[in-house]
């Protein structure tokens, strides 16, 4: 029993990217859009990936990457965001050698376009791309190659999910994406979402499979709830989406 507990404790340390773990993980927050940005690095090779950077906090991210002695290979987006402008474009200029990455189905510009099943490699690690459309057609979830953690974007939030009433969203598609691409991961796989509005930072597949108030419903009930949310549109959508279609590079003013 003691050995089993120790193995679990060691795995949890590894999953969280603590000082004794081979992978480095940092979770950062942008308060205006309540967006999480994730830095993952291989402590051995010093190669790193940044998930869902925000324009306003990209200089902060670049500074941290330099302080930690990492080399950023990719600035990746889980989808074309509507509530903030991505920092991918700025990071390409702040950290030469960094490439922007987004799903091909997003229709957005990037250095590299990915599809379901593609891997993003950094050092000894890789992020598996799992298409998880529904919030938008181009949404993806990034799963670490040992299935210890998943970065779910807006597809799956902690006790919630992304909305489906704009950007060609589809509630039925989202329901099946989460159940087939995320809930099939191990129960102790850590869930790291793109946003949280209630002070939470992380969940697990098992927690969301059993406790998520929307996604524990039937598909029919889920579709009905999502169709009756009547939420206001994101404040930045009119300029965030066009900018994000250009990798966060805004049109120069005359």
Curated annotation (Swiss-Prot):
Which family does the similarity line name?
Answer: Belongs to the metallo-beta-lactamase superfamily. Glyoxalase II family.
Query: What protein name is recorded for this chain?
Result: Persulfide dioxygenase ETHE1, mitochondrial
Q: Which disease is it linked to?
A: Ethylmalonic encephalopathy: Autosomal recessive disorder characterized by neurodevelopmental delay and regression, recurrent petechiae, acrocyanosis, diarrhea, leading to death in the first decade of life. It is also associated with persistent lactic acidemia and ethylmalonic and methylsuccinic aciduria.
Which cysteines pair up through disulfides? They are none
The note on cofactor binding and number reads: Binds 1 Fe(2+) ion per subunit.
Provide one Gene Ontology biological process annotation. glutathione metabolic process
Chief location of this protein within or outside the cell? cytoplasm
């Amino acid at each position: 029993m003691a050995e089993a507990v120790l193995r679990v404790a060691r795995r949890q340390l590894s999953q969280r990217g603590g000082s004794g773990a081979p992978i480095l993980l940092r979770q950062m927050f942008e308060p205006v859009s309540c967006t999480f940005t994730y830095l993952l690095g291989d402590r051995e090779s010093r190669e790193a990936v940044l998930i869902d950077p925000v324009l306003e906090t990209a200089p902060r991210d670049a500074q941290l990457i330099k302080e930690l002695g990492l080399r950023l290979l990719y600035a990746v987006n889980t989808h074309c965001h509507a509530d903030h402008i991505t920092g991918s474009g700025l990071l390409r200029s702040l950290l030469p050698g960094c490439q922007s990455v987004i799903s091909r189905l997003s229709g957005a510009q990037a250095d590299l376009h990915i599809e379901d099943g593609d891997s993003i490699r950094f050092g000894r690690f890789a992020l598996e791309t799992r298409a998880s459309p529904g919030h938008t057609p181009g949404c993806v979830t990034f799963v670490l190659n040992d299935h210890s953690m998943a970065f779910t974007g807006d597809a799956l939030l902690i006790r919630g999910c992304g909305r489906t009433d704009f950007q060609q969203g589809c509630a039925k598609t989202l329901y099946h994406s989460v159940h087939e691409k995320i809930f099939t991961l191990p129960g102790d796989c850590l869930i790291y979402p793109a946003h949280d509005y209630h002070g939470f930072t992380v969940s697990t597949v098992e927690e969301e499979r059993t406790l998520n108030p929307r996604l524990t419903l039937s598909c029919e009930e889920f579709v009905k709830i999502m169709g009756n949310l009547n939420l206001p549109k994101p404040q930045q959508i009119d300029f965030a989406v066009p900018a994000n279609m250009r990798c966060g590079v805004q049109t120069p003013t005359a």
